[in-house]
Amino acid sequence: LISAITNQLTVPGRSTGPVAFTIFDPVGLGQNFDGIMHLADFEERVISSRIWTQQAQFEQKLGELNEHIEKVTQMYLRNEYATLAEYNAQAGRMAEKYHFLVIADFPVNFSDVAVKRLQNIAASGPRCGVHLLIHWDQRKTAPVFPHRAPGLPRSAEIPTILRRFFPTV
């Protein structure tokens, strides 16, 4: 997957467009994404300066992505556009970036705060151009999502929006 993304975005003469990646790699400490770091050779801002590995960093970066979603919703989409793609089609050179949050070995190093922020991103992010690519290590205990109705079985802890990505959980 990472190789395909890298190949598509680094074709000579092709603009990457407004795209940014935020990458979490708590187990590999960045090694799982060595190849994608070459994108920084073409455009430094495409990768948010590094690969993040620590719990506090995850909380901070997820908070920043939540703030970005708030900004896009309130300043760009308002009641005029259903999605960031619609806004960008009209914005031309003022187009807003698409963000990809890439997570390896979820839920390692995810605090309750980080899980709640991730849930908000999963629910509201796609409309605002923030998309998730998550490798869920199913050998680890699944986190308890805060927006769960009491009395639901453990399998129902994963909200519907995330179950699309993880149907076997």
Where are these regions (language model features)?
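P-loop NTPase catalytic phosphate-binding loop
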Residues: L1-Y81, A91-V169
